[in-house]
A protein has these predicted regions:
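Soluble catalytic regions of membrane-associated enzymes that act on cell-envelope
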Residues: 153-192
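Membrane-embedded alpha-helical bundles of multi-pass enzymes
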Residues: 1-159
Length: 192
């Protein structure tokens, strides 16, 4: 259910596309808004089931969960031409310092790091890791990974100049277009 709720909240906007020509397509709205997120949630169900198979006692459980869920996200982004929309790693890509690591490990590496960082509090809950030393060591490893990502981001951004690149033409497109106007040949000039 968590996966369904996650994808439902991240894909609610898909339903708006069925309302452009509502007389023809509104009947498909439940498919886009309910069935599509439910199908995507199956990938997370697979990841959770795989994590359960890899379960072990102690801190390794968090790493098994993070690896299994990252694999599930990668499969979702790859199978049947893929749909990597709203991958968990995008939560780290919202910050310029942490997003720089994507240049090295990509979105799937950021996804693994996000699962580890955001899952770290579980090390202190429910007696998962009873040995205080192991708990602190595993938390230190995760914190060092995050600090390493931030440090790399700071170095990379510090080295980025604001230089102008010659012979580059940049075209900005207004994304908030009425869908009926979008394909009208006479609207091309105002859109572009």
């Amino acid at each position: 259910w968590f996966g369904f709720g996650f994808f439902l909240s991240g894909l609610w906007w898909v339903g708006a596309a069925f309302l452009v020509e509502a007389e023809s397509f509104a009947w498909l709205l439940p498919v886009g808004v309910l069935v599509f997120p439910a199908g995507l949630a199956l990938f997370w169900a697979f990841g959770a089931a795989l994590a359960r198979l890899l379960w072990s006692d102690g801190w390794a459980r968090l790493f098994a969960f993070a690896a299994a869920m990252t694999l599930a996200e990668w499969l979702r982004g790859t199978i049947l031409t893929g749909f990597p929309w709203n991958a968990f790693g995008y939560s780290l890509a919202a910050q310029p310092l942490t997003m720089q690591l994507a240049s090295v490990i990509g979105i799937w590496g950021l996804t693994l790091l996000a699962y580890l960082v955001f899952g770290a509090p579980v090390l202190f809950l429910g007696g998962l890791v009873s040995d205080r030393r192991s708990r602190l060591l595993s938390l230190a490893v995760i914190i060092l990974m995050l600090l390493g990502a931030i440090g790399y981001g700071a170095l990379r951004l510090n080295g980025a100049g604001g230089a102008t690149v010659a012979d580059v033409r940049l075209r900005l497109v207004q994304p908030a277009l009425d869908q009926r106007e979008k394909w009208q040949p006479g609207a091309a000039e105002s859109i572009m």
